[in-house]
A protein has these predicted regions:
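Positively charged n-region of N-terminal signal peptides that target proteins for export
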Residues: 1-5
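N-terminal, post-signal-peptide region of Sec/Tat-exported proteins
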Residues: 45-89
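Short acidic-glycine-tyrosine-enriched beta hairpin
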Residues: 59, 85-102, 196-214
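Short histidine-centered beta-strand/loop micro-motifs
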Residues: 62-68, 108-110, 172-177, 219-221
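Ligand-binding loop in jelly-roll beta-barrel domains
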Residues: 102-128, 192, 212-239
């Protein structure tokens, strides 16, 4: 009897373990964040600043020059050799580089195919209409903020570009706001952007501006991952994203 009871006990334990394993829900896919380029700015309050984004195309082997405000290049396809002073770096698809205000960058497309890249800029009003790249580059403006970025404070700021991928069927994240500001560019997939309770689909090529104080949410209801770029500015030592609405000060 004892042997039979022990056998039944072992069978029961095994069945329970199998049932528990079958009921275990796999963890949802994680959000993937990749830092593309970043720098630190000692101040952002000397003059009002704007976001601007342009797309640039260089024919195979063609050269151009970039001399503009603080900004970050992001290579979409092809390759670009970027030379700043004595330093040279070749950008492949998905790579980026910060170019500081006042620096002149020489750009050369690879010989195999055209070079296509984005140039995200943090510019004063005096540079808004200034071409980011010289001929023979084909430059197309994608976006500029109508008014200066609000809420910038004295002190240092982080300026960065991050590539983020939301997994398929990701529910909207909790309401949040930017401590500084950000400009999004949707690379692939379609996300749901919710502001004031209204959700709007945002597909490839969309640009979305998030100034300080804008409470919003992001999700991905689609069956494919959604990848986007976030050109972001936030106070040094403060998270780029903060929960809920900004705390009102007296």
């Amino acid at each position: 009897m004892r042997i039979r009871t022990a056998a039944f006990t072992l069978v029961g334990v095994a069945a329970f373990a199998a049932s528990a394993a079958a009921q275990t829900t796999p963890a949802p896919p994680a959000i993937i964040r990749t830092a593309v380029a970043a720098t630190k700015l000692p101040t952002v309050t000397d003059v009002p600043l704007y976001f601007k984004a342009v797309s640039v195309t260089l024919a195979p082997g063609a050269t151009s020059r970039a001399s503009a405000a603080n900004g970050i290049l992001y290579q979409i396809s092809g390759s670009t050799e970027v030379s700043i002073g004595a330093e040279t770096k070749t950008l492949g698809a998905g790579e980026g580089l910060f170019i500081a205000s006042g620096k002149v960058a020489s750009l050369k497309a690879g010989n195999a195919e055209p070079s296509n890249f984005l140039h995200f800029l943090l510019v004063p009003a005096t540079d808004l209409d200034r071409p980011a790249e010289t001929a023979p580059a084909t430059v197309r403006e994608l976006y500029r903020t109508v008014t200066p970025i609000p809420g910038l404070k004295a002190g240092g700021y982080d300026l960065n570009l991050t590539r983020i991928t939301f997994p398929a069927q990701m529910p909207s994240n909790p309401p949040h706001h930017r401590s500084g500001a950000a400009l999004y560019y949707i690379v692939s997939g379609t996300g749901a952007n919710t502001v004031d309770g209204k959700a709007e689909a945002r597909g490839p090529g969309s640009l979305i501006y998030e100034p300080f104080g804008l409470v919003h949410q992001w999700g991905n209801p689609g069956n494919q991952p959604m990848t986007f770029l976030a050109f972001n500015i936030n106070p040094d030592g403060v998270p780029a994203v903060l929960p809920g609405a900004p705390v009102k000060t007296q």
